[in-house]
Design a protein with these regions (language model features):
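Active-site cores of enzymes that catalyze phosphoryl transfer or operate on phosphate-rich substrates
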Residues: 1, 89, 223-284
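Conserved DEDDh/DEDDy metal-dependent 3′-5′ exonuclease domain
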Residues: 2-101
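A short acidic (Asp/Glu
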Residues: 29-31, 35-41, 192-193, 326-329, ...
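Cytochrome P450 catalytic domain signature, combining two hallmark sequence patches
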Residues: 47-53, 103-108, 197-208
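Common nucleic-acid-contacting/processivity interface regions adjacent to the catalytic cores
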Residues: 84-197, 257-307, 317, 328, ...
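Extended active-site and interfacial segments that coordinate phosphate-rich ligands
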Residues: 183-218
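Catalytic palm active-site di-aspartate
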Residues: 239, 270, 312-326
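C-terminal polymerase-core module
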Residues: 326-429
Length: 429
């Protein structure tokens, strides 16, 4: 369509909408540029332009906003929501913060959170989790708090030192390693919240049945189901079912990307559920709940490491909710099952085999070559796929030339399964 004649453009668009009557309009930059331009043109040329299917309502306009998330500043452009049909702008999607926008993910978010699809496609997963909590509270007859901020209870310096801590991180053993298994806890923090009944109204409360937070000794009542724990339970159960279904399909199967989009949406909701417990704008959380989750997470990882050592495994690195283990002659999934079963028995949490590496390289810290970088490694799975974390190609501020060059080098290394032959490939790179 030609933009030079605005009146003709508007008439052509009206005819297209009347002829095809679409249920969904997909755009790129539709919120921030296209629809504002069309509405301004319609006003300037006095053309009755209504992209909505509902003749009585043209559109709903939401102002642009700026917000911070995990140290990065994001701009959300103004939004144009239609009536009677959806408008989805894949360039104005908060879903794009963690993974590429997917309509299937937006629909899954809307289905789980009971938020309309146009809003779910644009809002952060944190807003979706808040909607889930509000819905759960209303079903249980719980009043919605008017004030978001909850005052933190006083702690002495010793109490604060014992309670205030994040996830546990063991530095990796620098170098090239062979036949390593990566074990990941399934949605560790959300699973802890569900298993331990952690919610704003249960942490710090005593009852007939109590569990105590490691280190701090804060009580968690088990007498009643916590709101957050009850909201998370169906979410985690569904994500676990989806992940197990994905294993039945190969990556090139048409069903695989569909299930991946659903799993991604559920993953983000579970991911933000933990951080929201200590967030000032959370209606139902408090900082004690956040501290309890971190403490239990640290204890869980220590238990997993101790279990691995007892069963004769070498732990190369452990990072918050995962650990990389190695054992002589252990290079098949069944070789690691006894370890996983024992960890699940001791912790009460599901742990999964992410994969077995033919070879894996942990890089050294830039400041001290004797110390491993906290989260920078790359390796080749036994099924041929390459896993890369913390390298230049993963950074958003890396230029394409550097990222592509690094990608080609690593792909060349991934062509070799025997780690002893890797040095010979360096000269070719």
């Amino acid at each position: 369509l030609d933009l030079s004649d605005e009146r003709e453009l508007l008439e052509n668009l009206k005819n297209i909408l009347d002829e095809y009557d679409p249920d969904v309009i997909f755009t790129r930059w539709g919120d921030g540029w296209l629809f504002p331009f069309l509405f301004e043109s319609a006003k300037r040329h006095q053309v009755d332009f209504n992209p909505s299917r509902d003749a009585q309502q043209k559109y709903r306009h939401i102002q642009e906003s700026t917000f911070e998330s995990y140290g990065s500043i994001y701009f959300r452009a103004q939004q144009t929501h239609l009536f009677g049909r959806w408008h989805i702008d894949n360039k104005n999607s908060t879903m794009d913060m963690g993974f590429k926008f997917s309509m299937r993910s937006a629909i899954e978010l809307a289905r789980v959170t009971s938020v309309d699809v146009q809003t779910a496609a644009r809002n952060s997963p944190g807003s979706g989790f808040t909607a889930m909590q509000i819905q759960g509270a209303l079903k249980r007859g719980i009043l919605i708090p008017l004030q978001k901020r909850q005052t933190e209870q006083f702690k002495s310096a010793l109490e604060l030192n014992a309670a205030d801590g994040g996830g546990l991180n063991y530095r990796p053993i620098v170098g090239l390693h062979q036949d390593i298994a990566e074990l990941d806890f399934f949605s560790m923090y959300p699973s802890i919240m569900m298993t331990w009944n952690i919610s704003g109204e249960t942490v710090g409360v005593r009852g007939k049945k109590i569990r105590y937070v490691p280190d701090s000794g804060v009580p968690i009542t088990q007498d009643v189901d916590g709101l957050v724990a009850s909201v998370l339970k169906p979410l985690l159960e569904k994500r676990l079912r989806v992940k197990r279904m994905m294993k039945k399909f190969t990556p090139d199967d048409p069903q695989h990307p569909i299930l991946q989009s659903v799993a991604d949406a559920l993953k983000w909701l579970g991911y933000v559920s933990f951080g929201y417990q200590g967030y000032k704008n959370n209606l139902f959380g408090n900082i004690q709940a956040h501290e309890a989750i971190c403490a239990i997470g640290r204890e869980t990882l220590v238990t997993a490491i101790e279990t691995a050592h007892e069963l004769g495994f070498r732990v190369l690195v452990a990072n918050v909710d995962s650990l990389f283990v190695q054992k002589e002659a252990a290079n098949r999934p069944q070789d690691f099952k006894p370890l996983m079963d024992e960890i699940m028995f001791r912790t009460g949490l599901i742990i999964e085999l992410e994969g077995i590496f033919d070879w894996l390289i942990f890089t050294a810290s830039k400041l001290n070559p004797r110390i491993g970088a906290a989260n920078r490694y790359f390796g080749k799975f036994d099924h041929g796929e390459l896993k890369v974390r913390g390298m230049a190609q993963r950074r958003s501020d890396t230029c394409n030339w550097i990222a592509n060059a690094e990608r080609e080098i690593l792909n060349l290394l991934a062509s070799e399964s025997n780690p002893a032959h890797l040095p010979a490939l360096i000269s070719q790179a």
